[in-house]
């Protein structure tokens, strides 16, 4: 089901619900403490499952090779979002299959609870919005390059939400992924790199 609903733009604080968050280095700063979930720059913790030396900045080439970024709801002291990088959809899928097994005892996919991810035209869940429950969807022209924030489905309903910069016929391009066990109850705002840039969405 793919529908658009009207919603008044409301200035609102971002409230973070208590969700499962993986253990992260002590040097990180909670996004909840910052009270800001604007997705901008990334600090890659792993790439294709391999640890990245935190003392060494990734080369520009390595950064360009990353096709999908899984954003974690934690930032380092510089304000960069901690993230897992993947150089292909195949490497991402391999991670997801293992991660689902790890999470299955915590969040059983039952289809209960909030079923869908909501996508909004403005930051902080403002303006019109659409919602999507499952699978891949090329956005219609009315929503192409229009998404500015999102609120994920429950982790008991599905695993993740991905924004793709291109449609499937255009090769997908880069993607930014939000794991529902991390982001449920939070509002992710897109900064310049992803604000009004998505041409397709995917719920797994």
Model-found features: residue ranges?
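Sec-dependent N-terminal signal peptides of Gram-positive bacterial secreted proteins and lipoproteins
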Residues: 2-29
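Compact beta-sheet-dominated domain cores in extracellular/mature segments
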Residues: 31-204
